[in-house]
Amino acid sequence: MANYRGGRINEEFKREISNLIQNEVKDPRLTAMISVTDVKVTKDLRYAKVYVSIFSKDDEEKKNNLEALKNASGFIRKSVGQKINLRHTPEIIIELDDSINYGMHMDELIQRISKGNE
């Protein structure tokens, strides 16, 4: 039963944080497309790890966008706390998720190999 509740809380946080990043965080350093890929809230509801994927051409822009998100984590926590009714609002920890970039890289390698075999 608790596992089901944890999943609902994770999805609710993911939806709210995605909405906040897209519509309410007003930082000029946020220039790339940002997607929240996963949220994992601890069982005691003290911490929420937010995994984001940042789509940009260069690593410097990606680093600046991640830093801007980390600086906005206090605002995100406050806003999520106002929208989701919990006893404690978890501390937001933002992590970069490179799984999509890694998958695209692997797909590119597979396509190169298949073209070489033809």
From Swiss-Prot:
<dbReference type="InterPro" id="IPR000238">
    <property type="entry name" value="RbfA"/>
</dbReference>
<comment type="similarity">
    <text>Belongs to the RbfA family.</text>
</comment>
<dbReference type="GO" id="GO:0030490">
    <property type="term" value="P:maturation of SSU-rRNA"/>
</dbReference>
<dbReference type="GO" id="GO:0005829">
    <property type="term" value="C:cytosol"/>
</dbReference>
<protein>
    <recommendedName>
        <fullName>Ribosome-binding factor A</fullName>
    </recommendedName>
</protein>
<comment type="subunit">
    <text>Monomer. Binds 30S ribosomal subunits, but not 50S ribosomal subunits or 70S ribosomes.</text>
</comment>
<dbReference type="InterPro" id="IPR015946">
    <property type="entry name" value="KH_dom-like_a/b"/>
</dbReference>
<comment type="function">
    <text>One of several proteins that assist in the late maturation steps of the functional core of the 30S ribosomal subunit. Associates with free 30S ribosomal subunits (but not with 30S subunits that are part of 70S ribosomes or polysomes). Required for efficient processing of 16S rRNA. May interact with the 5'-terminal helix region of 16S rRNA.</text>
</comment>
<keyword id="KW-0963">Cytoplasm</keyword>
<dbReference type="InterPro" id="IPR023799">
    <property type="entry name" value="RbfA_dom_sf"/>
</dbReference>
<dbReference type="Pfam" id="PF02033">
    <property type="entry name" value="RBFA"/>
</dbReference>
<dbReference type="InterPro" id="IPR020053">
    <property type="entry name" value="Ribosome-bd_factorA_CS"/>
</dbReference>
<dbReference type="GO" id="GO:0043024">
    <property type="term" value="F:ribosomal small subunit binding"/>
</dbReference>
<keyword id="KW-0690">Ribosome biogenesis</keyword>
